[in-house]
Curated annotation (Swiss-Prot):
This is Glycine--tRNA ligase beta subunit. It comes from the Bacteria. PANTHER family: GLYCINE--TRNA LIGASE, CHLOROPLASTIC_MITOCHONDRIAL 2 (PTHR30075:SF2), GLYCYL-TRNA SYNTHETASE (PTHR30075). One of its GO terms (cellular component) is cytosol. It comes from Vibrio atlanticus (strain LGP32) (Vibrio splendidus (strain Mel32)).
């Protein structure tokens, strides 16, 4: 009879940012193990709290089903000699399976007849299997760095304290990670019973919540935090900033969530909200509260891990903790504004960007020139772009950014505004880091875009130029920077060429670079980011590969090609023309020699080749405007009309004719046909 199954691993505090992924991987790995072991079940639910990982399997089979295993032996023609006696091959096979040749069955198919051994194998009870399945599931967790504890060589993400494995009300005995299975479960450190025994898997997780004051259901904890935080914010007339990453982290930090509201002095609101929010969210894991106009309120919401009889004391304690940090931010803000940003420019010479690439001042000089160069091409104000480039990194020398590093850029904007800098120049200091992550907002102006691209391109070309292209790790975030440049160009429709931009960045870096192939390497790298981007957007790999084969270096143009090929692929003629292009490519690849530049009309003999030649000539002229303007969708839609003459050509014309002149003429025709498509993409790479 199927029973519910429970495994709980009690540990020391698990890394909060990894808790969900650990639990999900544990469940996935364990379920895969059950499938491999052929153990049926109705479902698996994972549980995770700061000091435990658990799985509950509903209706787990009591064991494997009995089955018959068939082992095929040698063919009858090999198993017996001409006199019908068993050969050594047959005898050896039979002996290996513990039978005689006479006891073997026969397997007959339309392909022949073989000796066959049928063995009945009894299924193992689940108790003999689950400990090994669990151990393998835990061994397969995504643990970046395991640790040892005590005198043991056993490694896990954190020291393991308890293990409970129950099948119904039966304790499954065994050890995992050096800990023996027992009925003891640990509760909350400060509430409920710190240790108690569990009698049955069916009691979990309710017994843990009732007696141990631990809410093991991760999603339930998260739901409580979200609901109560929204109510708490509403109570003070605001809206809580419930960023999912922070909510997830807080959920992973508490076993018994209690949402409370605290406040801070109104005077701190004179400090830019970003600095206050940084310390609230980053340092303290608090949720800021805003009004309807997105102005920060002097309140914050936090989640306590204990249900106190005196919540006021808990609130006051948290207010006392955050107050000095906010006071620091206020002090830094007031102190930093006593000097204009531009006065800090020389100090950038004291900060190293990268040993071979120089100081941040060196980088600033390069950004300034490159931003002006880009601005000219995208019709942005050149002088303002250069001014923004010059000021871009000055806030790194301020006390605020030194203490609260994530405020770089935004504090530059505030300080520049205070200094009386142009509004768009100040904004560019903030937006230079955009986009900061996948899906993030792009810079909102041409000036900001020019500075953002200049900063990223200088880093990309510089790091590639000294031979430090990212492999496994990416310490300079070049993948993100590359995608950022591509997004800015594509989504704004800028007519920029990567070859030109990379060449200019290389020129500004000068003799600091040692990689002679830096331009080609960077283009390959950035085009590779295109592949990931379009795959995420839902475009199939073959469409992307078809465009990549042409190596277009204008990102906006690349985008038009991908969308055009995607549209073309849906046309009725697409599959046949893709196959024809592949056939043409194969034929041309086999020809070793030079082809005439033009078709000799006098050598056209068959009606089908005359028709195709005429169509190719007409199409070549008709498509010139579309190619010139990058209207690739229109071009491919027209090229789809070539399906019938192409099919007729291959049905009626022998390309590789005995007559050399005739053969070359036909190959030239096919080459011209293929070149029409290659002006957009290599559609021969499209799959069915």
């Amino acid at each position: 009879m199927a029973k519910n199954f429970l495994i709980e691993l009690g540990t020391e505090e698990l890394p909060p940012t990894a808790l969900r992924s650990l639990a999900e991987a544990f469940a996935s790995n364990f379920e895969a193990g059950l499938k491999t072991a052929e153990l049926s079940h109705e479902g698996i639910k994972w549980y995770a709290a700061p000091r435990r990982l658990a799985l509950k399997v509903t209706a787990l089979a009591e064991g494997q089903a009995d089955k018959v295993v068939e082992k095929r032996g040698p063919a009858i023609s090999v198993a017996f000699d001409a006199e019908g006696n068993a050969t050594k091959a047959a005898q050896g096979w039979a002996r290996g399976n513990g039978i005689t040749v006479e006891q073997a069955d026969r397997l007959k198919t339309d392909k022949g007849e073989w000796l066959l051994f049928k063995q009945e194998v009894a299924g193992k009870p689940v108790q003999e299997l689950v400990m090994d399945i669990a151990a393998k599931a835990l061994a397969g967790l995504p643990i970046p760095k395991a640790m040892r504890w005590g005198n043991s060589d056993i490694q896990f993400i954190r020291p393991v304290k308890t293990l409970t494995v129950l099948l119904g009300d039966e304790l499954v005995e065994g050890k995992i990670l050096g800990v023996a299975s027992a009925r003891t479960i640990r509760g909350h450190r400060f509430m409920g019973e710190q240790e108690f025994t569990i009698d049955s898997a069916d009691q979990y997780p309710a017994i843990l919540e009732e007696r141990g004051k631990v809410m093991a259901d991760y999603d339930a904890r998260k739901a409580i935090i979200l609901a109560d935080a929204k109510k708490a914010a509403d109570a003070v007339g605001g809206i809580a900033d419930l960023e999912d990453d922070l909510v997830e982290e807080v959920t992973s930090l508490v076993e018994w969530p209690v949402v409370l509201t605290a406040k801070f002095e109104q005077v701190f609101l004179k400090v830019p909200s970003e600095a206050l929010v940084y310390t609230m969210k980053g340092d303290q894991k608090y949720f800021p509260v805003y009004d309807a106009d997105k102005n920060l309120l002097p309140n914050f919401i936090f989640v306590s891990n204990i249900e106190s009889k005196e919540p006021r004391h808990v609130i006051e304690g948290n207010e006392k903790v955050v107050r000095p940090r906010l006071a620091d931010a206020e002090f830094f803000f007031n102190t930093d504004r006593k000097r204009p940003l531009i006065d800090r420019l020389a100090e950038l010479d004291q900060a190293i960007f990268q040993k071979q690439l120089g100081t941040i001042k060196d980088k600033t000089d390069r950004i300034t020139e490159l931003a002006g160069y880009i601005a000219e091409q995208i019709d942005a104000d050149v002088e303002k772009s250069k001014r923004a480039g010059l000021l871009a990194k000055c806030d790194l020398m301020t006390s605020m950014v030194f203490e609260f590093t994530d405020t770089q850029g935004v504090m530059g904007m505030h300080y520049a505004t205070h200094d009386g800098e142009d509004e768009q120049v100040a904004l560019a200091l903030y937006e230079q880091y955009m986009p900061r992550f996948a899906g993030d907002t792009l810079p909102s102006t041409g000036i900001s875009s020019a500075v953002a691209m200049a900063d990223k391109l200088d880093t990309i070309v510089g790091i590639f130029g000294i031979g430090q292209a990212p492999k496994g790790s990416d310490p300079f975030a070049l993948r993100r920077a590359s995608l950022g440049v591509l997004r800015i160009i594509v989504e704004n429709g800028y007519n920029l060429d990567l070859t030109d931009l990379i060449g200019k960045a290389k020129e500004l870096l000068g003799d600091k670079l040692t990689n002679e192939n830096v331009e080609a390497d960077v283009i390959d790298f950035m085009l590779g980011r295109f592949r990931a981007w379009y795959q995420d957007a839902g475009f199939s790999v073959d469409i992307i590969q078809a465009v990549l084969a042409r190596r277009p270096t204008k990102p906006a143009d690349f985008d038009q090609r991908v969308k055009a090929v995607s549209h073309f692929r849906e046309l009725e003629a697409a599959e046949a023309l893709a196959a024809a292009n592949k056939r043409v490519g194969n034929i041309l690849a086999k020809f070793d020699g030079e082809l005439p530049a033009e078709i000799d009309l006098a050598l056209l003999q068959e009606d089908a080749e005359k028709a195709l030649a005429e169509n190719v000539e007409v199409m070549t002229e008709a498509l010139e405007p579309a190619f010139a303007t990058g209207n690739y969708q229109e071009a491919l839609s027209k090229l789809a009309d070539l399906r019938e003459p192409v099919d007729a050509f291959f049905d009626n014309v022998m390309v590789m004719a005995d007559d050399e002149a005739l053969k070359k003429n036909r190959l030239t025709l096919l080459n011209n046909l293929r070149n029409l498509f290659l002006q957009i993409a290599d559609i021969s790479l499209l799959q069915k």
